Amino acid sequence: MCGIFGIVAHHARVPAEVLERATRSLAHRGPDDSGTVILRDSAREADEIGLGNRRLAILDLSPQGHQPMNDPATGNWVVYNGEVYNFREVRTKLEQSGLYFRSNSDTEVILKAYGHWGERCLHEFRGMFAFALWDAQRHRVFVARDPMGIKPMYFYQSDRYFMFSSEVRTLLGTGLVPRVIDCSGLLNYLTFGSLYDPNTLVEGVSALRPGCYLIWEEGQVKQEQYWDLVGPILGEDCDPACAGAEKRGELETQVAEMLDESVRRQLVSDVPVGVFLSGGIDSSSLVDILSRNGTRPSTFSIVFREADYSEGEYSRAVAQHFRTDHHEIMVAQSDFFAAIHPAIHAMDLPTIDGINTYFVSEQTRAAGVKVVLSGLGGDEMFAGYSSFRTVPRMERFARAWDCMPKAVRSPLASMFRTLAPANDQNRKLIALSRNGGGIVHPYFLSRMLFTLEQQNQLLPAMETNSAAFLRAQKPLTESLSRALGLDPVNRVSYLEARCYMLNTLLRDSDFMSMAHGLEVRVPLIDHRLARRILALPGSWKLDSGTPKPLLVGALDGRLPEQIVHRRKRGFTLPFEHWLRDALRPMVEDNLRKIGDGVLRTLISERVVRSVWQDFLEGRTSWSRPWSLYVLQCWCQRHLSN
């Protein structure tokens, strides 16, 4: 796991001090080693390429794993962040083709694989990765991101420079990117409480989307998609595991085998591996698989004094059942208050989530662990959210509503707006009644933070009409178009994976864990496993009596009953309580300043005060004022001149 940066100077020279400063800014992602190199394009001597890397040593701890890494046979160079779990298998294939290796690292496998297969090397890799490679023979930069989007990659292009990095903050820190807020990104953030790829909050900076690669050549950037959850892309062969096994029992066995394989693959490491344990089905399944494979893992859990939020009872039960080396991390209001500013500083992009991961990552790394497994993705793949039931109902409502004559719809909608209590759920129902099957799909409405109407009030100076809203949500409509052919449950699964999981959970997990030099691995979303699960009938993933029946069936009764049938709580902090108590003065003071900074010409101070008052009086969720607090903090730190 690492942090990477690169800069291509087109008809110019790479500023060496910019390369060094940008690489240093990623030190938290890679505290073990650092390296930079400046290359001259042999064919176009007017162009230079600078590559930088900060390394967290997990595989091949020797100096042979140093980056940037060069392949003398081709002249290619690579910087790489992540892990290719099947690198030994890929290496064997390459050795059989006559290639020679100097190290035991997966970095060199990527370098040689690209030299041998070109961009088709991406279909050989199973893992989480973002890498950039200077192709010396074709005089181009090749940048790629893993199929599920576990590892981040951002890029920026001007007339003179093309830059890429693991973090947006690093690009801003070069001084070559204007500190201008991106209005589509702002709308996107206010809609969902995080930025949805390829949007960022910085004008001109974009995220490379999952399962995509990018080629920079002669000053031009071209992007291609090589993989997606819903089917083969660019000639990739279907996974043979997706054929046959039509009976449910056989499929549960197959899912169990693929889960087991994914967990075992992700244990590849030259340092100890721990587990984030919440006491839910997903993380407990990882502990079960590790135990059956003869491993006694170290497990780490957050517990709170507020019993309504704490999962300590369940995580302790799992730890005792499987006899793990268990560590509990007690988080009190005072701890949160002390850590709030460092945690927000760790945010590469603003988000309403992720601070829980900051706490557990800090303590896990302090215990001497460099790598952990997480159950992230289990809810998306195995239908663990309430959205798997509510969104199909909302879809049916939208279709029925659209079939009604307008003369009937209008008075009904007006009556509901007049009589319904003013709360978040009713605001979404009102938006759905106005929208029907129109610009906002019910899934996106279910995840929505501020509706279009609320954004109009919050951003009076901006063009927040339907057209602007659609432009900001364009990536989501593309995801929806891919999901429309799936059954209702699998459609929600695809959208949760490509929207909420990708842009909130995975991104937050990455920058909050890497703030402490900790690598988080996610076996439940191995890309082949995820595609296999998405291909199964949605009806098999919902059951009136058993949560996540497909996953529970695959585990064959090995989890404690109290874990299987417990009420779902989620890995969350007691924000509702804390914002009304210890955090209230700090948040109120910050929200009062929202008119003094970079947001002063965009956001209505009056509406911000109204949002805060609605929260205090119980008319809206904590997430709305908290999102504005985080936005103000982030913009003040990164976009203020």
Residue ranges and their predicted role:
Residues H341-H345, S387-T390, W578-R580:
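Short low-complexity, flexible loop/linker segments enriched in glycine and/or proline
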